[in-house]
From Swiss-Prot:
GO cellular component: plasma membrane
Record-stated family: Belongs to the chloride channel (TC 2.A.49) family.
Name under which the protein is recorded: Putative ion-transport protein YfeO
Gene Ontology MF: a single term: monoatomic ion channel activity
């Protein structure tokens, strides 16, 4: 017979598995549709019209029209495509289900149109809203927070293709003063995360790791080098933190989301022309291209880092529906490669992983998630002790500093961007 504790843990197991599978399937469907639309906009249409895919006019035109289209969705859809991601954390309160169709359409348009944001925030919002709405009907005794935790864990597992990130994040979130052991509370979220990760793995494998020269033995000088790299990445990220609320306030003075996002798309188009096609989209596939291109110089990597960071700020400030983690990882990779090219004596594995750690820490203010992203992009067990040590001064630098988020104006309704 099972102990009462075990029976308690098993109560939410089936709902957790169902939520994890559903979270992954929603992500997969959205990404497949966005990929098909991206192929149409950036491959088939230019080829049919006899226009080069990297033509400045095409890049500016597509991104401007993408902004206008997203603005129309936000302006006229019920619920105005959910909350403005610039004003929300990654895991937020559930939104009304009526806002979800507009949010999904706005996300797909942004992903396909080349906007420098990832899918993580909108997908998280959709999955949490559906889990809370459906769960409250089927199992009304389970509170909203439980459904929120299960949906966010399933989504994290689906996004990263592994339950490890969910385990790290929720180990700090659920570690309260309760007498219930931590792993009892982690059981159902990890079931959801594992189900989400395994379902994603059936259709595609998220490819984060980069082909970077293997790092051998850690030396004391490497710790100092890594700390300096992380500090540089944090400094770059804090410039974006300073710019975001100011640009957001400036853009939203226009009140009309169609105008705001149209102008935002036009600016993103100009940045895309300067940075080239590799600086567009969410950044995961593009960072693979960046590493594979041996022709890039120090100045090229610097330009890509600056352009991508600027595009991230503009996209978030304009109200595009998307997340900031994936493009931030691209910025970290570009910064790391730039610093390695500038000082070849410091291994690329150190510069890239520590730059990712620093910039993701600025964006998320989550130490575990930052360590996870650095470790999966540069998968090397020898780096783990170094990254843990480098995290300490990085965390000190950011203690008490503002987050990369905009304070919501008091007069703005919770899910209205007009």
């Amino acid at each position: 017979m099972l102990h009462p504790r075990a029976r308690t843990m098993l109560l939410l197991s089936l709902p957790a598995v169902a939520i994890g599978i559903a979270s992954s399937l929603i992500l997969i469907v959205v990404m497949k549709i966005a990929s098909a639309l991206q192929n149409l906009l950036w491959q088939r249409l230019p080829g049919t019209l006899g226009i080069a895919q990297d033509s400045p006019l095409w890049i500016i035109g597509v991104l401007t029209l993408t902004g206008i289209a997203v603005g129309l969705v936000i302006r006229f859809s019920q619920g105005h495509a959910g909350p403005d991601p610039a004003c929300e954390p990654l895991i937020g309160a559930p939104v009304p289900p009526s806002a979800l169709p507009g949010l999904i359409v706005a996300l797909i348009l942004g992903l396909a149109g080349g906007v420098s944001l990832g899918p993580e925030h909108p997908i998280m919002t959709v999955n949490i809203a559906l889990a809370v709405a459906i769960g409250a009907r089927l199992l009304p005794r389970v509170n909203r927070m439980e459904w929120t935790i299960l949906a966010s864990a399933g989504t994290i597992g689906a996004l990263f293709g592994t339950p490890v990130a969910a385990a790290l994040i929720f180990s700090q979130t659920l570690n309260g003063s309760s007498e219930v052991p931590l792993w009892d509370r982690l059981f159902a979220p990890l079931m959801a995360a594992a189900a989400g990760a395994l379902t994603t793995g059936l259709f595609f494998h998220p490819h984060f790791s980069l082909p970077i020269t293997h790092y051998g033995q850690m030396e004391m000088t490497d710790i100092l080098s890594g700390a300096i790299v992380a500090a540089i990445a944090i400094a770059a990220g804090m410039v974006a933190v300073w710019c975001l609320p100011r640009l957001h306030a400036m853009m939203n003075q226009m009140k009309n989301p169609v105008l705001v996002l149209g102008i935002g798309g036009f600016i993103l188009g100009i940045l895309g022309v300067i940075g080239g096609p590799v600086s567009l989209f969410k950044g995961l596939d593009e960072m693979q291209q960046m590493v594979a291109n041996q022709a890039f110089s120090t100045s090229d990597y610097f330009l890509l880092a600056v352009i991508k960071l600027a595009a991230l700020v503009v996209a978030a400030a304009s109200g595009f529906r998307g997340g900031r983690i994936f493009p931030a990882v691209f910025v970290g990779v570009a910064l790391g490669l730039m610093l390695h090219e500038h000082v070849p004596a410091v291994p690329a594995a150190i510069t890239v992983s520590c730059a990712i750690l620093g910039i993701v820490l600025v964006v998320t203010r989550d130490g575990w998630l930052s360590l996870f992203m650095a470790a999966v992009v540069v998968p090397n067990t020898t780096l783990l002790p170094l990254l843990c040590i480098v995290m300490l001064p990085a965390w000190l630098l950011l203690a008490g500093k503002p987050m990369m988020m905009v304070n919501r104006p008091k007069q703005q309704p919770p899910h209205d961007n007009v």
